[in-house]
Amino acid sequence: MTDKRKDGSGKLLYCSFCGKSQHEVRKLIAGPSVYICDECVDLCNDIIREEIKEVSPHRDRSSLPTPHEIRHHLDDYVIGQEPAKKVLAVAVYNHYKRLRNGDTSNGIELGKSNILLIGPTGSGKTLLAETLARLLDVPFTMADATTLTEAGYVGEDVENIIQKLLQKCDYDVQKAQRGIVYIDEIDKISRKSDNPSITRDVSGEGVQQALLKLIEGTIAAVPPQGGRKHPQQEFLQVDTSKILFICGGAFAGLDKVIGQRINTGSGIGFGAVVKGQSEKATEGELLSQVEPEDLIKFGLIPEFIGRLPVVATLSELSEDALIQILKEPKNALTKQYQALFSLEGVELEFRDEALTAIAKKAMARKTGARGLRSIVEGVLLDTMYDLPSMDSVEKVVVDESVIAGQSAPMLIYGQPEAQASGE
């Protein structure tokens, strides 16, 4: 085909599909006795892309990894937390198996199993959810429960969560309905007391009520392309019963609630226990014994707990686990910085005692794995600032004294006589 504006007779030409003249479009492409404009070509491409999108979910469903494969993939990125990995692997496998079989098996309707993750800050809750979404190649979005309020109040509406998920997959509803939503800080929306209050709690119990139907499964009406709702608007209809919701929170103080329950009824007189079981147990051991009644006492309403039937607890990371996190996962922090330095043609080495010092510092901060990056970033900041302006640096070495703030990283130059310390 050739680009033509007029035929040999100089007659004005029109697109054979939309009827626009050659003056109304940028290009008019001619074939044997037919013309098509650039706008119609774009429209045809859009139609083909939409058909490809509709076919792709069926292809994805045929390759569902087994629980063992899911667990092994999580092992590549998340250190420790073995019980939580096992619970997540089974729950995620069952969820997507339910979707693949159309929510029923031999006429039996299969229930939805959303997940509640309980564990201290920096224990890997968010990373587990992100890694699962990457493995399954499904849309993933995160929401902060502390920003949510009931509809009609100042704050973020719970349906905005679905809007964010749609944005991640270019507003493809079918793809969004197979996605994963992670709601963080879910413990922060617990009601303020055990007893229901006559005053409205729009950011606590009110949000729990608003999330109920969304998590259980409803048809959410979402404005297309993120616009505001108005009566004459056409909405995108999203079935949330097919979306996997994972809620996570630190639940600070929940271990004490569990401890009180365990110690209740320990007896008096000859039947008394001198020291309660909970006083000897660690926080992680207590959290692993969590029951729905403990969560209710903490401030979650029974209906909300019922929508999160799968509960996985994560323990606080030990010093050894933090050292492993620094060097073993596929995207380990030390590997990330080594890759960053290699872009400058420089080798970065972390001595073993330096890794131990970083882990000890993170333990003291009580921020778990989340605090590791800020520590490493802090000790390497000056080096990363100066390195692009320096010549002949071949290697940077970080030892224990660097982490302690007693010296700067050692710089090793290409010429032996130019070896110097960055002090």
Swiss-Prot record:
One of its GO terms (cellular component) is HslUV protease complex. This is ATP-dependent Clp protease ATP-binding subunit ClpX. One of its GO terms (molecular function) is protein dimerization activity. The keyword Transmembrane helix does not apply. Keywords: ATP-binding, Chaperone, Metal-binding, Nucleotide-binding, Zinc. The keyword Nucleotide-binding applies. Belongs to the ClpX chaperone family. GO terms for biological process: cell division; proteolysis involved in protein catabolic process. InterPro entries: AAA+_ATPase (IPR003593), ATP-dep_Clp_protease_ClpX (IPR050052), ATPase_AAA_core (IPR003959), Clp_ATPase_C (IPR019489), Clp_protease_ATP-bd_su_ClpX (IPR004487), ClpX_bact (IPR046425), P-loop_NTPase (IPR027417), Znf_CppX_C4 (IPR010603). ATP-dependent specificity component of the Clp protease. It directs the protease to specific substrates. Can perform chaperone functions in the absence of ClpP. Zn(2+) binds at C15, C18, C37, C40. SUPFAM superfamilies: Glucocorticoid receptor-like (DNA-binding domain) (SSF57716), P-loop containing nucleoside triphosphate hydrolases (SSF52540). Coiled coil: none annotated. Residues 2-56 form the ClpX-type ZB domain. Gene3D superfamilies: 1.10.8.60, ClpX chaperone, C4-type zinc finger domain (6.20.220.10), P-loop containing nucleotide triphosphate hydrolases (3.40.50.300). Component of the ClpX-ClpP complex. Forms a hexameric ring that, in the presence of ATP, binds to fourteen ClpP subunits assembled into a disk-like structure with a central cavity, resembling the structure of eukaryotic proteasomes. ATP binds at P120, T121, G122, S123, G124, K125, T126, L127.
